[in-house]
Design a protein with these regions (language model features):
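Short acidic donor-binding/metal-coordinating loop in glycosyltransferase active sites
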Residues: 39
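Conserved AdoMet/S-adenosylmethionine-binding subsite of the radical SAM
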Residues: 18-29, 33, 42-189, 193-201
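Canonical Radical SAM [4Fe-4S] cluster-binding loop centered on the CxxxCxxC motif
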Residues: 1-13, 71
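Auxiliary Fe-S-binding modules of radical SAM enzymes
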Residues: 155-306
Length: 306
């Protein structure tokens, strides 16, 4: 997977040698999940996609510990024909079916940013065809100012996705990378949008989590705004963390109505956040692997689409 954060060239690595990936996975049985992402891996034709997926399910490679494969893509929103009428649509879906037949879970992590993206009839057909393979479709999107910073938009998206057989998964906070300032939504506003949207859907759509920041220490969720000892604070918790012991643990940050990202926040009731090293102001050179570029699930390996 490409590093998602700028100014960290040492964290960027990529290879098109699938044997390297297979060898790594064979040596690391603790890895149970592989995420194919990018970029958008569904830009790849079926022969290239097969070159990555087939070795993961080939019993000769001894990768029985791989339980799930995920494909992160926005192609359902901008190119649903990829799964319906394109020349290799049938072959792609056949490949999905082979992953399912191997006994593994296959999840298409579909990005939809607005309800309008769910309207085309060809999308409904694409969703039906993917689900017919046995794959599941989980949906996620960033909160984008002037595009979807409205509870009604998210309510409609989640309801429609459930009706179509998709599973709402994440509302993300816009990453602090690139020229994203115009689209950034303050965390306080993002929490209000999420809460109001969440209140208007049934339990079937409440599989969704957010607003979540995929930051360097891990995935950080904004759980609310409250007062503690007379101080207004954000309540947050780690959905995923470099240190697994921090997962699920709540912590506080001083309320800032303009804060848009984790690095905009200041700890309160402590001199540091739980994920910050206690002994070092910076990560020392002898611990180069402490803060990789993108937080994943426990036992997960992310593979770049090349």
């Amino acid at each position: 997977r490409w590093a998602q954060f700028v100014d960290e060239p040492d964290l960027k690595m990529a290879t098109d040698d699938i044997s390297t990936l297979v060898a790594y996975l064979a040596e690391h049985p603790e890895v149970t999940s592989v995420l194919i992402t990018g970029g958008d891996p569904m830009i790849m034709g079926e022969p290239v996609l097969r070159r990555y997926l087939e070795p993961l399910i080939d019993p000769r490679n001894g990768l029985d510990h791989i339980e799930s494969i995920r494909i992160g893509t926005k192609s359902l929103a901008y190119w649903p024909q990829r799964f319906v009428t394109d020349p290799d649509a049938d072959d792609t879906l056949m490949l999905f079916g082979e992953v399912i037949a191997s006994g593994r879970n296959l999840a298409v992590m579909a990005h939809f940013s607005h309800p309008r993206e769910l309207e085309p009839p060809v999308l409904a057909e694409a969703v039906r065809r993917i689900r017919d393979t046995g794959a599941v479709i989980r949906t996620q999107a960033p909160l984008i100012r002037s595009i979807n910073d409205d509870p009604a938009a998210w309510r409609e998206m989640w309801r429609t996705q459930v009706r179509m057989g998709m599973i709402p998964y994440y509302m993300f906070v816009e990453r602090d990378t690139g020229p994203q300032d115009y689209f950034a939504v303050p965390l306080a506003r993002g929490y209000d949008v999420f809460r109001q949207a969440y209140q208007g859907v049934s339990g079937l759509a409440r599989t969704v989590r957010g607003p979540s920041m995929s930051a360097t220490p891990g995935k950080v969720c904004v759980d609310g705004v409250t007062e503690v000892a007379g101080i207004k604070v954000f309540v947050l918790h780690m959905i995923q963390a470099r240190d697994p012991s921090l997962v699920g643990s709540p912590f506080f940050a001083r309320f800032d109505p303009a804060a848009c990202w984790l690095t905009d926040l200041e700890p309160v009731f402590a001199d540091r956040f739980p994920f910050e090293p206690a002994r070092y102001e910076t990560v020392p050179d002898e611990l180069p692997g402490l803060w990789p570029s993108e937080p994943g699930e426990p036992g997960e390996l992310m593979v770049p689409a090349i």
